[in-house]
Amino acid sequence: MKTVVVTGASKGIGRAVAKEFANNGYNVVICYNKSLSDAQQSLNEVSQTTRAIAVKVDVSNEDDVKNMVEITKKTFGNIDVLVNCAGVSDTRLLIDSTKEDYDFVFDTNMRGTYNTCKLVGREMLSNQSGKIINISSIWGLRGGSCESVYSASKGAIIAFTKALAKELGPNGINVNVVAPGFIQTDMTKNVTEEIKQEIMESSALGRLGTPEDVAGVVSFLASEKSEFITGQVISVDGGWLS
């Protein structure tokens, strides 16, 4: 049985991804940082269909990530798939931002992706196989007003992924990006109904996305059907960028 590690799996897109892999027969490692109760809910839902564990890990801390990798290896053996869903946002004018705001976003979004890809990537290199899917955002492709730092962090993930795909490809490891559009999660719950309506009207499909929309694409990129796809960015945005 294959094993997937999902960061940011306590809720939102990460939880949906964990459930998708559970339904596909994977062992699932639910990585969370803050909310034990949310992680426990994810674990309860995922454990109904597969073997799963929850591991507390601050992805910006390399020692935490090392510990998570060791726990995963002892519990399940190899790591076959890594999905980096852990992320934070910060909405404000750039001129009002602080160094701490910048560090908060980049430490989780970019440094976290770097740490997990580096340490899980070592395990995948030993096995000469693996799939890595990093979650970015359409703001990493186009940029969002009042989200310059967040957009930059998500753009960095895209550039990082493209480079890593070239680095790991000769060893049978695929590395891709999923760039969600407006997805209905806790991160977007404070967006006004007026703005939501504007987003729906400007997208080709005329609706907002769900975590399950993203999870389905992630599942495809982890499957054998995507063996010849690497270094790519797939937007899951209802045609908003089209």
Where are each of the predicted segments found?
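Active-site helix of classical SDR
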Residues: 117, 153, 161
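Substrate-binding pocket helix/loop in short-chain dehydrogenase/reductase
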Residues: 93-94, 98-106, 188, 199
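Conserved glycine-rich cofactor-binding loop
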Residues: 10-11
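C-terminal substrate-recognition "lid" of short-chain dehydrogenase/reductases
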Residues: 129, 173, 207-236, 241
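Alpha-helical segment proximal to the catalytic Tyr-Lys
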Residues: 122, 166-170, 227
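Residue(s) in the substrate-gating loop at a strand-loop-helix junction
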Residues: 137
